[in-house]
Design a protein with these regions (language model features):
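WD40-repeat beta-propeller superdomains and closely related acidic/aromatic-rich repeat-like regions
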Residues: 2-382
Length: 382
Protein backbone atom coordinates (compact mmCIF):
# COMPACT_ATOMS: atom_id res chain seq x y z
CA UNK A 1 0.00 0.00 0.00
CA UNK A 2 1.20 3.55 -0.56
CA UNK A 3 1.70 5.49 2.62
CA UNK A 4 -1.16 6.88 4.68
CA UNK A 5 -3.39 9.74 3.64
CA UNK A 6 -1.83 11.84 6.38
CA UNK A 7 1.62 11.30 4.87
CA UNK A 8 0.15 12.00 1.45
CA UNK A 9 -1.03 15.42 2.54
CA UNK A 10 2.29 16.31 4.11
CA UNK A 11 4.22 15.14 1.07
CA UNK A 12 3.37 17.71 -1.60
CA UNK A 13 6.86 18.48 -2.84
CA UNK A 14 6.24 20.64 -5.89
CA UNK A 15 4.47 23.82 -6.82
CA UNK A 16 4.20 25.53 -10.19
CA UNK A 17 6.46 28.51 -10.73
CA UNK A 18 6.18 30.44 -14.02
CA UNK A 19 9.46 31.38 -15.66
CA UNK A 20 9.55 35.07 -16.50
CA UNK A 21 6.25 36.49 -17.77
CA UNK A 22 3.16 34.28 -17.50
CA UNK A 23 3.45 31.50 -20.08
CA UNK A 24 0.73 30.74 -22.59
CA UNK A 25 -1.69 28.07 -21.37
CA UNK A 26 -0.11 24.67 -21.90
CA UNK A 27 -3.14 23.01 -23.37
CA UNK A 28 -5.13 23.41 -26.35
CA UNK A 29 -2.65 25.92 -27.74
CA UNK A 30 -0.13 23.08 -27.60
CA UNK A 31 -2.27 20.88 -29.79
CA UNK A 32 -0.25 20.01 -32.90
CA UNK A 33 -1.98 21.75 -35.77
CA UNK A 34 -1.24 20.62 -39.33
CA UNK A 35 1.17 23.54 -39.73
CA UNK A 36 3.02 22.69 -36.52
CA UNK A 37 5.38 20.03 -37.76
CA UNK A 38 8.24 19.07 -35.50
CA UNK A 39 10.66 20.60 -38.01
CA UNK A 40 8.81 23.93 -37.70
CA UNK A 41 9.04 24.19 -33.92
CA UNK A 42 11.94 22.09 -32.66
CA UNK A 43 14.40 25.01 -32.54
CA UNK A 44 11.96 27.21 -30.67
CA UNK A 45 11.15 25.24 -27.54
CA UNK A 46 11.56 27.28 -24.38
CA UNK A 47 10.81 26.58 -20.69
CA UNK A 48 7.18 27.54 -20.07
CA UNK A 49 6.55 26.33 -16.54
CA UNK A 50 8.68 25.05 -13.70
CA UNK A 51 7.58 22.92 -10.76
CA UNK A 52 9.93 23.66 -7.92
CA UNK A 53 10.19 21.64 -4.69
CA UNK A 54 8.49 23.59 -1.94
CA UNK A 55 10.29 21.90 0.93
CA UNK A 56 13.65 22.95 2.29
CA UNK A 57 15.19 19.63 1.31
CA UNK A 58 15.74 19.37 -2.44
CA UNK A 59 15.54 15.97 -4.10
CA UNK A 60 16.42 14.76 -7.57
CA UNK A 61 13.75 13.59 -9.99
CA UNK A 62 14.79 10.12 -11.20
CA UNK A 63 12.27 9.32 -13.96
CA UNK A 64 9.61 10.88 -16.21
CA UNK A 65 6.91 9.31 -18.38
CA UNK A 66 3.89 10.52 -20.38
CA UNK A 67 0.67 8.56 -20.73
CA UNK A 68 -0.42 7.37 -24.19
CA UNK A 69 -2.62 10.43 -24.79
CA UNK A 70 0.04 12.90 -23.72
CA UNK A 71 -2.34 14.38 -21.16
CA UNK A 72 -0.50 13.33 -17.99
CA UNK A 73 3.10 13.13 -16.84
CA UNK A 74 4.39 11.04 -13.95
CA UNK A 75 7.63 11.78 -12.12
CA UNK A 76 9.42 9.66 -9.55
CA UNK A 77 11.91 11.16 -7.15
CA UNK A 78 14.52 10.51 -4.49
CA UNK A 79 11.97 11.74 -1.95
CA UNK A 80 10.15 8.43 -2.61
CA UNK A 81 7.12 10.19 -4.04
CA UNK A 82 5.15 9.68 -7.25
CA UNK A 83 4.06 13.01 -8.70
CA UNK A 84 1.37 13.29 -11.40
CA UNK A 85 0.95 16.37 -13.62
CA UNK A 86 -2.01 17.37 -15.78
CA UNK A 87 -0.51 18.58 -19.06
CA UNK A 88 -3.66 20.29 -20.35
CA UNK A 89 -4.11 22.26 -17.14
CA UNK A 90 -0.39 22.78 -16.58
CA UNK A 91 -0.40 21.79 -12.92
CA UNK A 92 0.53 19.10 -10.44
CA UNK A 93 -2.57 17.10 -9.52
CA UNK A 94 -1.49 14.25 -7.27
CA UNK A 95 1.35 13.20 -5.00
CA UNK A 96 1.51 9.60 -3.78
CA UNK A 97 4.28 8.69 -1.31
CA UNK A 98 5.95 5.28 -1.42
CA UNK A 99 8.18 5.56 1.61
CA UNK A 100 8.27 1.87 2.47
CA UNK A 101 9.56 0.55 -0.85
CA UNK A 102 10.86 3.64 -2.63
CA UNK A 103 10.10 4.40 -6.27
CA UNK A 104 11.96 4.58 -9.57
CA UNK A 105 11.14 4.15 -13.27
CA UNK A 106 7.47 5.13 -12.85
CA UNK A 107 5.63 4.22 -16.06
CA UNK A 108 2.03 4.69 -17.17
CA UNK A 109 0.37 1.53 -18.42
CA UNK A 110 -2.14 1.85 -21.28
CA UNK A 111 -4.63 2.73 -18.53
CA UNK A 112 -3.86 6.33 -17.55
CA UNK A 113 -4.86 5.74 -13.94
CA UNK A 114 -2.36 2.93 -13.45
CA UNK A 115 1.37 3.31 -12.88
CA UNK A 116 4.01 0.60 -12.82
CA UNK A 117 7.23 1.28 -10.95
CA UNK A 118 10.34 -0.34 -9.54
CA UNK A 119 11.23 -0.48 -5.85
CA UNK A 120 14.44 0.99 -4.48
CA UNK A 121 14.52 -0.70 -1.08
CA UNK A 122 13.16 -3.63 1.01
CA UNK A 123 12.97 -5.83 -2.08
CA UNK A 124 13.42 -5.60 -5.84
CA UNK A 125 9.83 -6.17 -6.91
CA UNK A 126 7.74 -4.15 -9.35
CA UNK A 127 4.49 -2.58 -8.23
CA UNK A 128 1.30 -1.67 -10.10
CA UNK A 129 -0.41 1.35 -8.55
CA UNK A 130 -4.03 2.42 -8.96
CA UNK A 131 -3.85 6.21 -8.86
CA UNK A 132 -7.53 6.69 -8.09
CA UNK A 133 -7.54 4.43 -5.04
CA UNK A 134 -3.89 5.08 -4.18
CA UNK A 135 -3.41 1.38 -3.56
CA UNK A 136 -1.40 -1.34 -5.24
CA UNK A 137 -3.18 -3.76 -7.54
CA UNK A 138 -0.35 -6.23 -7.98
CA UNK A 139 3.28 -6.99 -7.16
CA UNK A 140 5.68 -8.60 -9.63
CA UNK A 141 8.48 -10.48 -7.92
CA UNK A 142 11.35 -12.35 -9.54
CA UNK A 143 14.43 -10.11 -9.54
CA UNK A 144 17.14 -10.48 -6.89
CA UNK A 145 18.80 -7.12 -7.42
CA UNK A 146 17.90 -3.56 -8.43
CA UNK A 147 15.74 -3.08 -11.53
CA UNK A 148 17.52 -0.90 -14.09
CA UNK A 149 14.92 -0.57 -16.87
CA UNK A 150 11.18 -0.98 -17.47
CA UNK A 151 9.74 -1.06 -20.99
CA UNK A 152 6.05 -1.45 -21.79
CA UNK A 153 4.83 -2.91 -25.04
CA UNK A 154 3.21 -0.26 -27.26
CA UNK A 155 0.52 -2.71 -28.30
CA UNK A 156 -0.48 -4.76 -25.26
CA UNK A 157 -0.26 -5.17 -21.48
CA UNK A 158 3.07 -6.98 -21.70
CA UNK A 159 6.27 -5.43 -20.41
CA UNK A 160 9.90 -6.28 -19.78
CA UNK A 161 12.19 -5.50 -16.87
CA UNK A 162 15.98 -5.55 -16.60
CA UNK A 163 17.92 -6.06 -13.40
CA UNK A 164 21.41 -6.00 -11.97
CA UNK A 165 20.91 -9.70 -11.25
CA UNK A 166 21.72 -10.20 -14.96
CA UNK A 167 18.20 -11.21 -15.92
CA UNK A 168 15.52 -9.82 -18.21
CA UNK A 169 11.96 -10.78 -17.24
CA UNK A 170 8.93 -10.75 -19.54
CA UNK A 171 5.58 -10.02 -17.92
CA UNK A 172 1.87 -9.50 -18.43
CA UNK A 173 0.25 -6.84 -16.26
CA UNK A 174 -2.59 -9.23 -15.49
CA UNK A 175 -0.37 -11.86 -13.88
CA UNK A 176 2.04 -11.58 -10.98
CA UNK A 177 4.20 -14.37 -12.41
CA UNK A 178 6.85 -13.74 -15.06
CA UNK A 179 5.96 -15.12 -18.49
CA UNK A 180 9.61 -15.75 -19.29
CA UNK A 181 13.16 -14.95 -18.28
CA UNK A 182 16.51 -14.45 -19.99
CA UNK A 183 19.89 -14.77 -18.30
CA UNK A 184 22.42 -12.48 -19.98
CA UNK A 185 25.58 -10.52 -19.20
CA UNK A 186 24.70 -7.07 -17.82
CA UNK A 187 21.39 -6.70 -19.71
CA UNK A 188 20.62 -3.37 -18.10
CA UNK A 189 18.58 -1.63 -20.84
CA UNK A 190 15.75 -2.80 -23.10
CA UNK A 191 13.20 -1.40 -25.55
CA UNK A 192 10.27 -2.52 -27.70
CA UNK A 193 10.17 -1.55 -31.35
CA UNK A 194 7.00 0.32 -32.50
CA UNK A 195 5.44 -2.88 -33.86
CA UNK A 196 5.80 -4.55 -30.43
CA UNK A 197 7.27 -7.64 -32.09
CA UNK A 198 10.96 -6.95 -31.48
CA UNK A 199 12.78 -6.30 -28.22
CA UNK A 200 16.26 -4.86 -28.08
CA UNK A 201 18.43 -5.61 -25.06
CA UNK A 202 21.68 -3.78 -24.34
CA UNK A 203 24.50 -5.81 -22.80
CA UNK A 204 26.97 -3.20 -21.68
CA UNK A 205 29.88 -5.40 -20.62
CA UNK A 206 29.91 -7.00 -24.09
CA UNK A 207 29.23 -3.70 -25.92
CA UNK A 208 26.39 -5.34 -27.81
CA UNK A 209 22.69 -4.90 -28.61
CA UNK A 210 20.68 -8.13 -28.91
CA UNK A 211 17.47 -8.24 -30.95
CA UNK A 212 14.83 -10.85 -30.11
CA UNK A 213 11.53 -11.81 -31.68
CA UNK A 214 9.22 -11.21 -28.72
CA UNK A 215 7.11 -14.24 -29.64
CA UNK A 216 10.24 -16.42 -29.64
CA UNK A 217 12.26 -14.79 -26.89
CA UNK A 218 13.53 -18.20 -25.72
CA UNK A 219 15.37 -18.63 -29.03
CA UNK A 220 18.73 -17.07 -29.81
CA UNK A 221 18.62 -13.39 -30.84
CA UNK A 222 18.01 -12.97 -34.56
CA UNK A 223 20.55 -10.14 -34.69
CA UNK A 224 23.44 -8.89 -32.56
CA UNK A 225 24.92 -5.43 -33.02
CA UNK A 226 28.51 -5.31 -31.77
CA UNK A 227 29.46 -1.76 -30.81
CA UNK A 228 32.91 -2.51 -29.38
CA UNK A 229 34.75 -1.07 -32.38
CA UNK A 230 32.51 2.01 -32.41
CA UNK A 231 33.05 2.56 -28.69
CA UNK A 232 36.81 2.39 -29.22
CA UNK A 233 36.43 5.04 -31.90
CA UNK A 234 34.01 7.43 -30.21
CA UNK A 235 34.02 6.68 -26.45
CA UNK A 236 37.27 4.85 -25.59
CA UNK A 237 37.50 6.03 -21.99
CA UNK A 238 34.01 4.85 -21.04
CA UNK A 239 33.64 1.66 -23.08
CA UNK A 240 30.93 -0.60 -21.65
CA UNK A 241 30.27 1.64 -18.67
CA UNK A 242 28.16 4.62 -19.62
CA UNK A 243 25.09 3.47 -21.56
CA UNK A 244 21.99 5.11 -20.11
CA UNK A 245 19.19 4.83 -22.67
CA UNK A 246 17.93 2.46 -25.37
CA UNK A 247 15.05 3.66 -27.58
CA UNK A 248 13.58 2.96 -31.00
CA UNK A 249 12.37 5.87 -33.09
CA UNK A 250 8.63 5.90 -33.80
CA UNK A 251 9.23 4.97 -37.44
CA UNK A 252 11.23 1.93 -36.32
CA UNK A 253 14.20 2.86 -38.50
CA UNK A 254 16.63 4.08 -35.84
CA UNK A 255 17.85 2.93 -32.46
CA UNK A 256 19.26 5.38 -29.93
CA UNK A 257 21.97 4.28 -27.51
CA UNK A 258 22.31 7.14 -25.06
CA UNK A 259 25.52 7.47 -23.06
CA UNK A 260 26.49 9.63 -20.14
CA UNK A 261 29.63 11.33 -21.29
CA UNK A 262 31.01 11.68 -24.82
CA UNK A 263 27.79 11.57 -26.85
CA UNK A 264 25.03 9.32 -28.17
CA UNK A 265 24.91 6.62 -30.86
CA UNK A 266 22.15 6.47 -33.48
CA UNK A 267 22.04 3.05 -35.13
CA UNK A 268 20.27 1.74 -38.19
CA UNK A 269 17.69 -0.46 -36.44
CA UNK A 270 17.88 -3.11 -39.17
CA UNK A 271 21.61 -3.29 -39.90
CA UNK A 272 23.12 -2.11 -36.62
CA UNK A 273 25.47 0.31 -38.33
CA UNK A 274 26.20 3.56 -36.50
CA UNK A 275 24.56 6.17 -38.70
CA UNK A 276 25.58 9.04 -36.45
CA UNK A 277 27.40 9.91 -33.26
CA UNK A 278 25.90 12.94 -31.51
CA UNK A 279 28.39 15.32 -29.91
CA UNK A 280 28.30 18.75 -28.29
CA UNK A 281 27.57 18.12 -24.64
CA UNK A 282 29.86 19.43 -21.95
CA UNK A 283 30.32 16.83 -19.23
CA UNK A 284 27.96 14.20 -17.87
CA UNK A 285 24.33 14.37 -16.75
CA UNK A 286 25.19 13.89 -13.09
CA UNK A 287 23.22 10.65 -12.91
CA UNK A 288 24.43 7.10 -12.42
CA UNK A 289 24.44 4.84 -15.47
CA UNK A 290 22.75 1.48 -14.72
CA UNK A 291 26.10 -0.32 -14.63
CA UNK A 292 27.57 2.27 -12.26
CA UNK A 293 28.10 2.01 -8.51
CA UNK A 294 29.13 5.66 -8.22
CA UNK A 295 26.43 6.60 -5.74
CA UNK A 296 25.13 9.36 -8.02
CA UNK A 297 21.34 9.85 -8.22
CA UNK A 298 19.41 7.43 -10.41
CA UNK A 299 18.18 8.44 -13.86
CA UNK A 300 16.84 7.07 -17.13
CA UNK A 301 19.11 8.79 -19.66
CA UNK A 302 19.14 12.39 -20.81
CA UNK A 303 18.32 12.01 -24.53
CA UNK A 304 15.35 10.84 -26.59
CA UNK A 305 13.88 10.92 -30.10
CA UNK A 306 11.27 13.43 -31.18
CA UNK A 307 7.95 11.93 -32.26
CA UNK A 308 8.81 12.08 -35.97
CA UNK A 309 12.06 10.18 -35.46
CA UNK A 310 14.12 12.86 -37.20
CA UNK A 311 15.60 14.65 -34.20
CA UNK A 312 17.19 13.73 -30.90
CA UNK A 313 16.96 16.11 -27.94
CA UNK A 314 19.26 15.80 -24.97
CA UNK A 315 20.85 17.46 -22.00
CA UNK A 316 23.98 19.55 -22.44
CA UNK A 317 25.72 18.30 -19.31
CA UNK A 318 27.29 21.17 -17.39
CA UNK A 319 26.36 23.83 -19.95
CA UNK A 320 22.65 23.80 -19.01
CA UNK A 321 21.22 23.89 -22.52
CA UNK A 322 18.99 21.35 -24.22
CA UNK A 323 20.69 20.20 -27.41
CA UNK A 324 18.90 19.29 -30.65
CA UNK A 325 20.44 17.03 -33.30
CA UNK A 326 19.03 16.43 -36.78
CA UNK A 327 19.91 12.84 -37.67
CA UNK A 328 19.00 13.48 -41.31
CA UNK A 329 22.24 15.44 -41.46
CA UNK A 330 24.11 12.13 -41.30
CA UNK A 331 25.14 11.95 -44.95
CA UNK A 332 27.40 8.94 -44.48
CA UNK A 333 27.74 6.06 -42.02
CA UNK A 334 29.45 7.15 -38.83
CA UNK A 335 28.80 10.86 -39.26
CA UNK A 336 29.73 12.97 -36.24
CA UNK A 337 26.89 15.41 -35.74
CA UNK A 338 26.89 18.65 -33.79
CA UNK A 339 23.67 20.18 -32.44
CA UNK A 340 21.59 22.25 -34.83
CA UNK A 341 20.19 24.20 -31.88
CA UNK A 342 20.88 24.87 -28.22
CA UNK A 343 17.70 25.62 -26.32
CA UNK A 344 18.47 27.96 -23.42
CA UNK A 345 17.79 26.78 -19.89
CA UNK A 346 18.91 27.93 -16.46
CA UNK A 347 19.24 24.45 -14.96
CA UNK A 348 20.72 21.06 -15.70
CA UNK A 349 18.76 18.63 -17.87
CA UNK A 350 19.34 15.17 -16.41
CA UNK A 351 16.13 13.61 -17.81
CA UNK A 352 14.07 14.52 -20.88
CA UNK A 353 10.93 13.14 -22.52
CA UNK A 354 8.91 14.18 -25.57
CA UNK A 355 5.12 14.30 -25.31
CA UNK A 356 3.73 11.61 -27.67
CA UNK A 357 0.80 13.75 -28.85
CA UNK A 358 1.39 17.45 -28.23
CA UNK A 359 4.20 19.78 -29.25
CA UNK A 360 5.55 19.78 -25.74
CA UNK A 361 8.37 18.17 -23.80
CA UNK A 362 9.36 17.78 -20.16
CA UNK A 363 12.77 17.78 -18.52
CA UNK A 364 13.98 17.41 -14.97
CA UNK A 365 16.86 17.50 -12.57
CA UNK A 366 15.71 18.74 -9.18
CA UNK A 367 12.70 20.43 -10.77
CA UNK A 368 10.24 19.38 -13.47
CA UNK A 369 10.10 21.77 -16.43
CA UNK A 370 7.45 21.97 -19.18
CA UNK A 371 8.73 23.17 -22.57
CA UNK A 372 6.61 24.68 -25.34
CA UNK A 373 7.38 26.24 -28.74
CA UNK A 374 7.79 29.97 -28.21
CA UNK A 375 5.98 32.11 -30.79
CA UNK A 376 8.25 35.11 -30.15
CA UNK A 377 11.31 33.01 -30.88
CA UNK A 378 9.76 31.73 -34.11
CA UNK A 379 8.76 35.26 -35.19
CA UNK A 380 12.31 36.55 -34.72
CA UNK A 381 13.58 33.93 -37.17
CA UNK A 382 11.20 34.96 -39.95
Amino acid sequence: MPDSQQDHQSETPQVGTPLGPPPPPVPRSATPLPTQKVTDVIRHYRPAKLFRPSKRDVYHVTSLDFDDRGEFLVAAGEDETIQVFDILEGKSTKSVPSKKYGVHLARFTHHSRQILHASTKVDDSLRLLDLHKESYLRYFTTHKDKVTCLALSPGSDTFISCSKDDTVALWDLNSRNAQGKLKLATPYLAAFDPSATVIAIASQSTSSILLYDYRNYDKVPFATFDLATQEERYTPSTRGRMWTRLEFSNDGKSLLVGTDYHGHFVLDAFEGTVNAFLTGRNGASGRAAPVSSSGKPLGQGDACFTTDGRFVVGGGGDQHNVLVWDIQQATEIGSVLKPIAKLPHRGRTAIIEMNPRYNMMASADKEVVFWLPDEHSRASDR
